[in-house]
UniProtKB/Swiss-Prot annotation:
It catalyses: D-ribose(out) + ATP + H2O = D-ribose(in) + ADP + phosphate + H(+). It is a peripheral membrane protein. This is Ribose import ATP-binding protein RbsA 1. Belongs to the ABC transporter superfamily. Ribose importer (TC 3.A.1.2.1) family.
């Protein structure tokens, strides 16, 4: 049943507030969702989206005064079981599955079928397998009920979570950043599935920072800011400028802030020739000029990150040369790269970039603390000053420099990592998925930093899976396919940088068309 066929809302959250010690996370927020609707929820990190959904899912109790209605009836959701009984299911970014159990056992978790006594009887695994076959077939699952979850891909595990929600007869399905770990093809399959569930009458609450996804899926979009409800837009009135202004509370004109002047690069900074690792990168060459932003695009698995790590010296190469100016650095030496003025921002900031249990100050200073050493002792005052300057210049939202970086939002963590790299005064900066998992406001600030660095003469390489981002920030784009450079757009090629052109090069369809002619 579509929204047009059902004027009565399925879900109403009215006047919801939530206070934590010294923090008011939600302030009188309301949300209305109809059956057969994909209702997106947007806002910067810390806006209150997750808190609102945790109240709906029973993970949190709201403050007194608000109410939740389903089908017009007021209900109390005092825990996850109450939420499930009310028809609410949530699929979080971190999937909640038991990898050592089968698909059927995960679908029935907490509702196991038993032989004989329903409470104490032995678990009837065969009955559970039979009981979930229909829902797996309905969702087009490429695996059976007896498959161990540990053997499934992330996309398939996500499908198990959706199957569990459908099997419990959920009517309201919340999805929090579901495409973050997925490839483009897996994302397309997920979108088809979401639309199928909408046609079956489910209400989908979809949380994402990715504007393209919001446009593609949403029937309506509601925006939160600083714990308060800002407004709801119908699909017909959606625009990036309007959504961003609602989220950040100000107009962000020129979101990417790129001044698309005629291509006029500075002197050659970085030269990479015939670099290869023997398997994933096969003879790639590129040049980067002073003041240039070079985008590297391609499908997942094309070799973009591997190429960046080879250039940086983080992975051994079997052949090829990397020169920064007149200096050639070793085959496996990030230290040489950093000393020469080349730094790399990893795509996995939590595991490979940041020290989450250390302070913001220490994370910013750790690459340059030897500069402050005097007779074997660190100059703590200079380190504190450096951290304060970085916090101010990159607009890092933090109460003080001594807070652990693990407590910050994704966008602020990314800016801490970026500030550490900038303290080394780089000549070349490689950014691997620099805005992954960060909110709209933080994205805009990162784009500002990229463009300021380029104007100062730094050469910047941006690797991104978001095509609007690549198109928005880059002067020139290299597209990779199967470990090789498939083509170049922009720059002196005078070939427009478009999504269609990038996709054609990334998939090989352009080459296939040429061969056909």
């Amino acid at each position: 049943m579509s929204r047009s066929e059902s004027p009565r809302p399925l879900l109403e959250m009215r006047g919801i507030s939530k206070t934590f010690p010294a923090v008011r996370a939600l302030d009188n927020v309301s949300l209305t969702v109809y059956p057969g609707e994909i209702h997106s929820l947007m806002g910067e990190n810390g806006a209150g989206k997750s808190t609102l959904m945790k109240i709906l899912s029973g993970a949190y109790r709201a403050d007194a005064g608000g109410e939740i209605l389903i089908d017009g009836q007021r209900i109390e959701i005092d825990g996850p079981l109450a939420a499930r009984d009310a028809g609410v299911a949530v699929i979080y970014q971190e999937l909640c599955l038991s990898p050592n159990l089968t698909v059927a056992e995960n679908i029935y978790v907490g509702r196991e079928l038993r032989r004989g006594n329903r409470r104490w009887g032995t678990i009837d695994r065969a009955a559970m397998a039979r009981g979930c076959q229909d829902v797996l077939a309905r969702l087009g699952a490429p695996f059976g009920p007896d498959t161990l979850v540990d053997t499934l891909s992330i996309a398939e595990q996500q499908l198990v979570e959706i199957a569990r929600a459908v099997h419990t007869r959920a009517r309201i399905l919340v999805m929090d950043e579901p495409t973050t770990p997925l490839s483009s093809r897996e994302t397309e399959h997920l979108f088809r599935l979401i639309r199928q569930l909408r046609e079956e009458g489910l209400a989908i609450i979809y949380i994402s920072h990715r504007m393209a996804e919001i446009y593609e899926l949403s029937d309506r979009v509601s925006v939160l800011r600083d714990g308060a409800y800002v407004g709801t837009l119908e699909r017909a009135s959606l625009s990036a400028e309007r959504l961003v202004a609602m989220m950040v509370g100000r107009d962000i004109s020129g979101f990417y802030k790129k001044e698309h002047a005629p291509y006029d690069p500075g002197h050659l900074l970085l030269s990479v020739r015939d670099i290869a690792d023997g398997t994933r990168v096969r003879g790639c060459s590129l040049d980067l000029h002073a003041g240039e932003v070079l985008g590297i695009a391609g499908l997942v698995g094309a070799g973009r990150t591997e190429l960046a790590r080879l250039i940086f010296g983080a992975e051994p190469r079997v052949r090829g040369d990397v020169k920064l100016g007149e200096r050639t650095f070793g085959a496996h030496s990030p230290r040489d790269a950093i000393d020469a003025g080349l730094v790399y921002l990893t795509e996995d900031r939590k595991r490979q970039g940041l020290f989450l249990d250390m302070s913001v100050r220490d994370n910013i200073n750790i690459s340059v603390c030897n500069r402050d050493a005097r007779l074997g002792a660190l100059d703590l005052a200079r380190g504190a000053e450096r951290a304060r300057d970085a916090i101010a210049s990159l607009s890092i939202r933090v109460p003080h420099a001594n807070v652990n970086v693990g407590a910050l939002s994704g966008g602020n963590q990314q800016k801490v990592l970026l500030s550490r790299l900038l303290e080394t005064k780089p000549r070349v900066l490689i950014l691997d998925e620099p805005t992954r998992g960060v909110d709209i406001g933080a994205k805009s600030e990162i784009y500002r930093i990229i463009n300021e660095l380029a104007r100062a003469g730094v050469g910047v390489i941006v690797i991104s899976s978001e095509l609007p981002e690549i198109i928005g920030v880059a002067d020139r784009v290299l597209v990779m396919r199967e470990g090789e450079i498939a083509g170049e757009l922009g720059g002196h090629t005078h070939t427009p940088i478009t999504q269609e052109a990038i996709i054609a090069l990334a998939t090989g369809s352009q080459a296939e068309l040429a061969d056909a002619h």
